Amino acid sequence: DSLDPAMNTDTDADSIFHALYENLMRESDDGSGEVMLTNGMAKEYTEETNYDGTVTYRFTLRSTARWSDGEKVTADDFVYAWQRLADPATNSPNHSLMSVVAGYDEVRETGNKAKLQVSAKDESTFVVTLSAPCAYFIEGICTAVATMPLRRDLTEDGAGFDMPNVVSNGAYHVSAWSKSSKLTAVRNEEYYEARLVGPDELGFVFASGSEEAWKLYEAGDIDYIAHLPDSVIAELSQDKNWKPTAVYATACVLYNHESDLFSNEHIREAFDLAIDRAAAAAAGGAENTPATGLVPSGIPDSGETDDDFRTTGGVLRSIDEEDVNARQAEAREELSYAGYYSTSMFPPIELLYVTGTENDAVAAALQNMWSTTLGVTVMLRGVTQAEYNARMEAKNYELALQKITALYDDAMGFLDRWCSESEQNLINYENGTYDVLIGVAAASENLVARTAFLHDAEMMLFDDMAPSPVYFDGTAHLLRDTLRGVCTDGFGNSYFTGVRVNTD
């Protein structure tokens, strides 16, 4: 609905933003179909640790960086965009990306966006001071959609995000846009690497769902599907060599820790133990895998090894069938510890979720597990996204089903949301020790120590039965075999600048 990078929350739309805009750093194809980090608008940068523990980055912008109307991309475009993102008046859902920048808390408290420690030394030098070292700043913050540069002259009146006024600084710019059906982007001839960009034109078709997209693909109307329908995935999954593409998202059962029932740890544990994660993942689709922790596969660890955070953290919830059966027997005991010696004593409860997605099947599977194992009555409450958001923000729920995602590829993005004062803590979880662990990790300059603190924090969430991770999200995409060069990252973003005709 909008081409305002600061306001985007649709992960599917991220691929469009990455085609139209470019940040200080960018992701690109490494030549083998994998994503690699490379310089974007910034041709180089320096990092300096200051006497007070803050860290200053100086980015030198490319002299050839241009907007699609020929205007030069300047440091002030980044200053404006980042201050606007942090400004409470903007009401961006992505403002927490700026929380690592010095002055962010003052901006949020006072509304004075000038307090954010970003500046333009000159038109080609963008300076950022962080309140502490941040392991994911370059790869996470400096590539994010929400921190893309913006033109002050085109943004302040809002007209710059509607046709025909849309101006962008990426490899493509918008040539036509029908909000309900299709966006067409053409090569930006002002782009500094315009001659290396693949297709002359990209057409993003907004299908009503994966089944409609598949019909368009079969008819030859589109060349790439970002999300294959379940029927096609089920067929592909019969091939033992086929693997889905993991994305950085974990479907979780959320407990309201201030509700009469789920303030009791034994009840939370009973509901967690009763979950058969393999069955729940399968109910959601063949592309999903059972969750063995909260932080999903693919998120980097300390960097000392090639192992990711999940591999290093190990299996926090076994998905072995024998272990699941034993845990389900234990679940009934946990209810008795909470004083519910008979299932007839346990009141009916409601599971809140967004309907019209895989959630419908997953919610039904969970309902059956809790009924079969615990003998409790769980009523399903499928609602619209808007109603779901309103009820979660008001903490008006007992149980909820939600996919937990992060704005950057770091374990912190999945863990700091559960801190007592976090705006994202929708479960009313409070643990002072947990808050300290996250705080120490955030301030640590030693990556190995930082990661160790984060592993301890994840384990504490499981010890406290804070949320219950159910499955890791996955996806499956398909490019027509006459083409090559689309690469995807862990967020499910697709990059198209390297697409070429397949000559093999």
Positions of PLM-derived features:
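Aromatic- and charge-enriched surface segment that lines or borders ligand/interaction sites
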Residues: 44-97, 127, 218-219, 261-263
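Gly/Pro-rich hinge or "lid" segments in bacterial periplasmic/extracellular proteins
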Residues: 29-32, 113, 124, 130-201, ...
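N-terminal lobe/hinge region of extracytoplasmic solute-binding protein
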Residues: 1-50, 167
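Structural transition elements
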Residues: 288-337, 358-360
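Surface-exposed binding/hinge segments that line
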Residues: 58-60, 77-79, 90-151
